Design a protein with these regions (language model features):
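N-terminal Rossmann-like or analogous alpha/beta NTP/dinucleotide-binding catalytic cores
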Residues: 2-141, 297
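A broad detector of the eukaryotic-type serine/threonine protein kinase catalytic domain
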Residues: 12, 46-47, 147-152, 207, ...
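Short capping/connector residues at structural and topological boundaries
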Residues: 12, 16, 53, 102, ...
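Structured ligand/cofactor/substrate-binding pocket environments in proteins
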Residues: 17-23, 39, 54-58, 77, ...
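A generic secondary-structure signal for well-formed alpha-helical elements
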Residues: 66, 73, 101-105, 149, ...
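Short helix-capping/linker segments at secondary-structure and domain boundaries
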Residues: 103-107, 146-153, 255-263, 293
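Conserved nucleotide- and phosphate/pyrophosphate-binding catalytic cores
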Residues: 166-335
């Protein structure tokens, strides 16, 4: 049997995950775990790059991320789930990669620019980029090359983030006259982006998100805040689903083809008011997450199982990374 190709991806534990994470990342991981050797990391070192002074909730955030993953269908029997900081080999590999990476590569990397924006939004215009944040792209590459992954699942707007990893792998291979590291390719996820309730990009810091862990009441309240067709003043006004900034986009994701067609037709005919439409939408979303919430509650009440999954994942991941690091040290000629 042909050996499965390896996939590496991760998330920073900066708070509870929202529906954007669910649709944009997790549902794709659930599919990939069936056909690939998947490694999914809770990137707690990366969380420190912009949240180094706010670590009180870091451990709880790690558990909540993993619980969300498990509840949404990530299967520890199919995928390796681990916490980044439990794999010290990543940190050592980060050093070696940093030695061969030109400074201008780092400065132009979009990942660093994105992280700098996050830091600026938190600390204001006088914020200073720390050494750890400057090295974010190198550490991200170390995460990927520590398991010598073939693919990195990303959205179309993140393809450039993988290019630096490819450049670094190629640079290491050229410097040390080897072909050891795979140049990982982006594996595109074509899921449409889910906007926040205000129509902007969904994000925890924007207070426009709907969290995976939200209960029915909270989810309904948030969906009732969703922006619809701004030009529609009365219930019987003819609607324009194509101008419905949020609610109809949610219908297109959570509704059946028949339901979507009905919503569109009734809206255009002025037979469906926006408030009623959002109430029905909330029912659909709550129905979709019913089993996920039940599984989430189970893992919240069985945290020992979550810890055991992470321990097993760390052991498996370290076995792979330790072998790779030994090879890297030998290639470089370390003592």
């Amino acid at each position: 049997m042909e050996e499965k190709k390896r996939i590496m991806s991760g998330m920073r534990p900066t708070g509870r995950l929202h529906l954007g994470h669910y649709l944009g990342v997790i549902t794709n991981w659930v599919k990939l775990q069936n056909d690939y050797d998947c490694y999914f990391s809770v990137a707690d070192w990366h969380a420190l790059t912009t949240g180094y002074d706010k670590t009180e909730q870091l451990k709880d955030n790690v558990y909540n991320v993993v619980i969300d993953w498990l509840a949404c269908g990530i299967d520890p029997k199919k995928a390796t789930i681990f916490v980044q900081s439990t794999i010290p080999e990543i940190a050592e590999l980060n050093i070696y990669l940093g030695m061969v990476t030109p400074q201008n590569w780092i400065e132009r990397d979009p990942t660093l620019k994105d992280m700098a924006k996050i830091l600026k939004s938190k600390e204001g215009t006088n914020s200073q980029i720390g050494f750890g944040l400057m090295g974010y792209p190198v550490l991200m590459t170390a995460d990927i090359l520590a398991v010598n992954a073939h693919y990195v699942p990303v959205g179309i707007d993140q393809v450039a983030h993988v290019e630096l990893t490819r450049d670094m792998a190629r640079r290491f291979n050229n410097v040390y006259h080897t072909d050891y590291f795979v140049e990982p390719s982006p594996k595109l996820n074509n899921c449409p982006l889910l906007p926040g309730v205000d129509g902007a990009k969904m994000g925890k810091s924007f207070n426009n998100d709907i969290k995976i862990s939200d209960d029915e009441e909270t989810t309904t309240k948030r969906i009732m805040q969703c922006i619809t067709d701004r030009s529609r003043a009365r219930k019987d006004d003819l609607g324009h689903p194509d101008k419905c900034e949020v609610a109809f986009k949610y219908w297109q994701i959570f509704g059946t083809p028949e339901e979507i067609a009905q919503v569109e037709a009734e809206c255009k005919a002025g037979k469906r008011g926006c408030a009623d439409c959002k109430r029905q939408l909330a029912q659909k979303v709550n129905e979709h997450f019913k089993e996920i919430r039940e599984r989430r509650k189970y893992y919240e009440n069985h945290l020992d199982e979550v810890k055991a999954i992470l321990a097993e994942g760390a052991e498996k991941s370290r076995a792979v990374s330790a072998k790779i690091l030994t090879d890297v040290r030998n290639i470089i000629g370390m003592y």
